[in-house]
Amino acid sequence: MLKNILLATVTSVFLLLSVAIHAEPISVVFTCELKDGKTKEDAMAVNAKWLKWARATGGSDEITSSFVSTVIGDMGSFMWVDTYPDITTWGKIADGDSGLDAEFDAVSTCSGNRMYRGEQTVPAK
């Protein structure tokens, strides 16, 4: 009996920890370059369609997407920074097909992407 209670307790703790991990916001960052003759506005027009699709598919208006441009440094590249309320919402997007790949490919070339989970620093007391 004690063994069953201990097993149930340990299982519950792991389940609670996994829920906490899944509830944390994540960001996906794509490093890209605009194609010749294309503008930030061209890229953002395609991305606006994607964001509408992503929010409907993910079931969350908390999904955001930003065009991040260089202020100092290599001016030829930009980043898409997509933020999701949790990994589960991102998974719905990753499993889906927006049908916009060709439109994105027409305006930009992306060389890589990374997924990040940030942890906010609390100021010292």
Specify the residue positions occupied by each region the protein language model found:
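Mature extracytoplasmic domains of secretory-pathway proteins
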Residues: 52-55, 75-77, 89-92
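Short N-terminal segments immediately surrounding and downstream of signal-peptide cleavage
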Residues: 23-41
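Short amphipathic alpha-helices within nucleic acid-binding modules
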Residues: 40-42, 85-96
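Glycine-rich beta-strand-turn "strand-cap" elements at beta-sheet edges
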Residues: 6, 22-27, 61-79, 100-125
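Bacterial N-terminal signal peptides that target proteins for export
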Residues: 1-10
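Solvent-exposed beta-strand motifs enriched in subsets of small alpha/beta binding domains
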Residues: 31-32, 80-82
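N-terminal signal peptide c-region/cleavage motif recognized by signal peptidases
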Residues: 18-20
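Short amphipathic alpha-helical segments
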Residues: 38-64, 98-102
